[in-house]
Amino acid sequence: MAETYLTLTNKVIARLNEVELTSANFTSARGIQVQCQNAINEAIRYINQREYNYPFNHATAAQTLTAGTVKYSVPASTKVVDYNTFRLVKDSDLGNGSVTLSPLNYNEYLKSYVEQEDEIETTTLSQSHTDSVTTLTVASTTGFSSTGTVYVGNEVMTYTAVGSSTTLTGVTRAVSSTTAAAHASGVQVAQFDDGGIPKYVTRTLDNNYILYPFPTKSYSLKFDYFTFPADLAAHGDTTTIPDRFAAVIVDGATA
């Protein structure tokens, strides 16, 4: 049976010759019992902080890219990312194969490629749109050219005029061999001239990542990373640390 927050806590309590807890009174612990609960989490935290790449903390992230978006965030639980594992998932509908991205130093990105960030205008749809409407209602048209091309999801559209501060009119749907689709409110609308299938990934100073070139379609991206697990809270919560190391946790909690 897998070790739980309750069973680990009771092993510490037993070493101290105190009254053990049950699932019914676990949240009502008092005094030394609370100290034992806290000690379990402190021991687990200590173990997880000692090494970056414990195999039991390995995870794979899946990110759907957004056309015209350069920077993306790593999962909130991330401790360290393996930047050699970034890859695009093959998608025949989008026209991309399975591609492994090459890591690119942040300073090199700033020196050679950062200008891509200045080539993109973005806004969002302010209401849902069917697959046939010819006017896009957006949050703002500031920065958009008087006529041009926009990317919404995997659909490319052209428009003939900026109708107002919140509308693009004369829209032609499904250009560049894309497919007309319905789009929900809040979906990004982007305008740019370049972009493509990403080839490089750059770790930013805030431990997120940048893609170059920025994507022009909703490609699927995957990468491997290692997590820093959250503290145990409920009596039935389990740790990522294998049960065979339960004694190490208990030893740490009673040290």
Q: Where in this protein do the model-derived segments appear?
A:
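Autoprocessing Asn-cyclization modules and mimics
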Residues: 54-58, 62-63, 67, 99-104, ...
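Glycine-enriched, solvent-exposed interface loops adjoining structured elements
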Residues: 1-122, 189-255
